[in-house]
């Protein structure tokens, strides 16, 4: 069985590849990327438990697509955008339930702390000014660091694209990022503000 089939975030990428490259070519790419993913983990089994392990399928797909002359970065980033829009719809549905956005805002400092904690492999700088602004500068991210160590840091941009797209789904919360470490910036500058007019 192709190990990529067990990676929930990447399941739909196979379907997108079929639409972009044709069924036969996409199936070959998917199979070879699965083999590359297995090779990466065989070479360094500890990577499976790395905080940035979600980037490994992207690295395998990036390498395979590039070796076949495809624009791996564009294909993966388009997929990240698509998944981000899908997640944004889910987030919007949840935060449209009366009281949910205020509940999230009440606990936003703790949520932010857990989602970008150093125990998850992040280096960060808190820049919050409560109660109006909660923010964190991510100075290094485990996904980017792992992809960079494997020599394919651009592979992780699809996760950044997903992230930026899904952030638009919050109702009553403006969740923004204008820079990203993976794009060469000093940090990923996450900023959250409560906005009751945001629909």
For each of these PLM feature ranges, what is it?
Residues 1-63:
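N-terminal, charged low-complexity regulatory/assembly segments
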Residues 28, 122-125, 175:
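Generic structural motif
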């Amino acid at each position: 069985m192709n190990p990529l089939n067990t990676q929930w975030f990447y399941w739909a990428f196979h379907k997108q590849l079929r639409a972009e490259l044709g069924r036969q070519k996409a199936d070959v790419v998917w199979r070879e990327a699965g083999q590359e993913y297995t090779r990466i983990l065989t070479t360094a089994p500890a990577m499976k438990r790395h905080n940035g392990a979600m980037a490994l399928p992207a690295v395998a797909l990036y390498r395979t697509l590039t070796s076949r002359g495809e624009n791996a970065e564009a294909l993966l980033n388009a997929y990240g955008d698509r998944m981000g829009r899908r997640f944004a719809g889910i987030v919007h549905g949840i935060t449209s339930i009366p009281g949910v956005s205020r509940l999230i805002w009440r606990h936003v400092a703790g949520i932010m702390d857990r989602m970008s904690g150093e125990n998850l492999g992040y280096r960060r700088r808190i820049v919050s000014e409560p109660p109006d602004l909660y923010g964190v500068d991510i100075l290094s991210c485990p996904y980017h660091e792992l992809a960079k160590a494997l020599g394919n840091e651009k592979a992780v941009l699809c996760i950044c694209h997903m992230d930026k797209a899904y952030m638009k789904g919050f109702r009553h919360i403006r969740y923004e990022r204008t820079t990203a470490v993976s794009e060469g910036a000093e940090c990923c500058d996450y900023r959250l503000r409560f906005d009751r007019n945001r629909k």
